[in-house]
């Protein structure tokens, strides 16, 4: 917080919020709060984690791609200031609306590893965070992102691609 208060250009991002561990409405509230702290500089990183990590929390790990698609759809509407009622397979918010929506769109980044999630990220995300892959797989991962982007009528240039380095 102190760093953000003293700067104007540094962005802040959630590393990766596990979408299995909190509903999209709560994540939207947290993202809106980040945007209040650093107006126009918040970014939201989301991911599905792994079966093993979800098991630690006692949370099932099912339908990661369709769950992510639904989550992001709800999140975008809530962050746009809409009153959201959604009848999804996984989430069903009823009349939820932020008391104060962010004035600018908060970019959503998806952590992705497997081809289907990489394609989904290319289709619906503002950015993609690659992790846990050897350098030789980066080119193929980017090709999968490009496939998803093309399906949505987007260009790879529309998507910010980052990579965790370990």
Could you tell me what each predicted segment is?
Residues 1-166:
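Active-site-adjacent structural elements that line small-molecule/cofactor binding pockets in enzymes
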């Amino acid at each position: 917080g102190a760093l953000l208060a003293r700067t104007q250009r540094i962005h802040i991002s959630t590393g990766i919020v596990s979408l299995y561990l909190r509903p999209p409405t709560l994540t939207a509230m947290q993202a809106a709060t980040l945007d209040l702290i650093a107006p126009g500089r918040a970014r939201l990183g989301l991911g599905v984690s792994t079966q093993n990590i979800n098991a630690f929390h006692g949370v099932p790990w099912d339908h990661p791609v369709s769950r992510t698609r639904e989550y992001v759809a709800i999140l975008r509407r809530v962050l746009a200031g809409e009153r959201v009622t959604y009848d999804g397979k996984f989430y069903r918010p009823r009349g939820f609306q932020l008391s104060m929506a962010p004035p600018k769109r908060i970019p959503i980044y998806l952590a992705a590893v497997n081809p289907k999630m990489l394609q989904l990220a290319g289709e619906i995300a503002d950015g993609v965070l690659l992790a846990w892959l050897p350098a030789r797989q980066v080119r193929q991962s980017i090709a999968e992102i490009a496939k998803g982007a093309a399906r949505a009528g987007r260009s790879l240039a529309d998507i910010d691609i980052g990579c965790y380095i370990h």
